[in-house]
From Swiss-Prot:
Amino-acid biosynthesis keyword on record: yes
Pfam families, per database record: OTCace (PF00185), OTCace_N (PF02729)
Name of the featured protein: Ornithine carbamoyltransferase
Main location, first listed in the record: cytoplasm
NCBIfam families: orni_carb_tr, PRK00779.1
Role: Reversibly catalyzes the transfer of the carbamoyl group from carbamoyl phosphate (CP) to the N(epsilon) atom of ornithine (ORN) to produce L-citrulline.
Residues reported to bind L-ornithine: 162, 220, 224-225
Superkingdom in the source lineage: Bacteria
Gene Ontology molecular function: amino acid binding; ornithine carbamoyltransferase activity
Residues binding carbamoyl phosphate, per UniProt: 53-56, 80, 104, 131-134, 260-261, 288
PANTHER family tied to this protein: ORNITHINE CARBAMOYLTRANSFERASE, MITOCHONDRIAL, ORNITHINE TRANSCARBAMYLASE, MITOCHONDRIAL
Pathway: Amino-acid biosynthesis; L-arginine biosynthesis; L-arginine from L-ornithine and carbamoyl phosphate: step 1/3
Length: 306
């Protein structure tokens, strides 16, 4: 099997994604039934962090251990990557001592260069541009709660960040629509818009209009990592883009609310919504664990028969 990476959502076909979702359900059921499943015994995951994280580290490290393998944590401050070693050189060495690599960093270019020089699969744990593992978990969570996402409408409210970018890619691959509402100056990046089928998304000035009839309403923090200096300015700019009960009430009555966490109640979402009956954020967070186990299994072992 040729080396397969997961650097952007569109790296996988619809068929591959459906397979990963199917495997996620099976693996999750094994976990919930306390059935040991160790297909990655004696395999090693190296996790490289330039951006700190709770959920990404925990889900990958625990997931690898639950599949029988081991995980090694590296951060750029304590490794040669933080001392100027070329990414290409690091990839050559690290990939000779591991079976799979997950990287959480700032620039997409870094992970692309690493993958180009790696002998093993590379997973994007998050970059400024994309967050494919999170959207994988989000879509799986929607399927668990409401069924197939094809033909549905996702409302994105807030910053057109890596999450928004990845939702747009996912809409292309899995055939659904995204309604996007952002404050002026925080819109979808022009270079990305040109790559997306215009039938897959629509931009709204008013977040209420974006949520109207939506099947899934989602948002993220107003100030992502690396943009802390803009925090006060962003709080003012995003004040009208807080997902509240009124927005959820104009959505489909069966709509669910998602947030990749951590959340700031009273900023991007009200407590009424995130702690309310339509919120599935805790299942969404847990599903990072299970969907990434299925992802790692597929990247290392290919399709499991039977």
């Amino acid at each position: 099997m040729a080396i397969k990476h997961f650097l952007q959502f569109k790296d996988f076909t619809r068929e591959e994604l459906e397979y990963v979702f199917e495997r996620t359900s099976w693996i999750k059921n094994q976990f919930k039934s306390y059935q040991k499943y160790w297909p990655l015994s004696d395999r090693t995951l190296v996790m490289i962090f330039e951006k700190a994280s709770t959920r990404t580290r925990l889900s990958f490290e625990a997931g690898m251990q639950q599949l029988g393998g081991s995980a090694i944590y590296l951060n750029t401050r304590d490794s040669q990557l933080g001392r100027g070693e070329p990414v290409e050189d690091a990839a050559q060495v690290i990939s000779r001592m591991s079976d799979i690599v997950m990287i959480r960093t700032f620039e997409q270019e870094i992970i692309e260069r690493f993958a180009a020089n790696s002998r093993v699969p590379v997973i994007n744990g998050l970059t400024n541009e994309y967050h494919p593992c999170q959207i994988l978990a989000d879509i799986y969570t929607y399927i668990e709660h409401r069924g197939c996402i094809q033909g549905k409408t996702v409302a994105w409210v807030g910053d057109a960040n890596n999450m928004c970018n990845t939702w747009l890619q996912a809409a292309e691959v899995l055939d659904f629509k995204v309604h996007v509402s952002t404050p002026p100056a925080y819109e979808i990046q022009p270079e990305l818009v040109g790559k997306i089928n215009p039938a897959r998304f629509k931009v709204f000035a008013d977040p209420m209009d974006a949520c109207r009839g939506a099947d899934l309403v989602t948002t993220d923090v107003w100030t992502s990592m690396g943009f802390e200096a803009e925090n006060e300015e962003r709080i003012k700019a995003f004040a009208d883009w807080c997902v509240d009960g009124d927005m959820m009430r104009v959505a489909n009555p069966q709509a669910v609310f998602m947030h990749c966490l951590p959340a700031h109640r009273g900023e991007e979402v009200t407590a009424e919504v995130i702690d309310g009956p339509q919120s599935v954020v805790w299942d969404e967070a847990e599903n990072r664990l299970h969907v990434q186990k299925a992802l790692m299994e597929y990247l290392m072992l290919g399709r499991i028969q039977g």
